Amino acid sequence: MPQTPSVCVIGAGLSGLVATKALLDRAITPDVFEIGSAIGGNWRYDNDNGRSAAYASLHIDTSKDRFALADHPIPKSWPTYLHHSQVLAYL
């Protein structure tokens, strides 16, 4: 039987969370490292990691239908272009 690889994911922003989910879907449990105290990366306004470029009125520039993950839909009641706080809640 093949040995399960040891994997780490750097960052728990959108890309890091998607990578983590893909690994978990393949029965690989990664170690996830995030410099901030919570997930969200660039979508976390006032992120305590000091690296987020989010600003108070930030919205995504693509529709929620294009942004959503295939097996994790965005609520239909949410607007087409999400505010950063909604993106963070979605994550």
Please provide the spans of the model-predicted regions.
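Short, solvent-exposed coil/turn segments
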Residues: 2-3, 62
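N-terminal Rossmann-like FAD-binding beta1-loop-alpha1 element of flavoenzymes
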Residues: 3-32
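Glycine-rich active-site loop/strand segments that organize a redox cofactor
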Residues: 35-38, 42-90
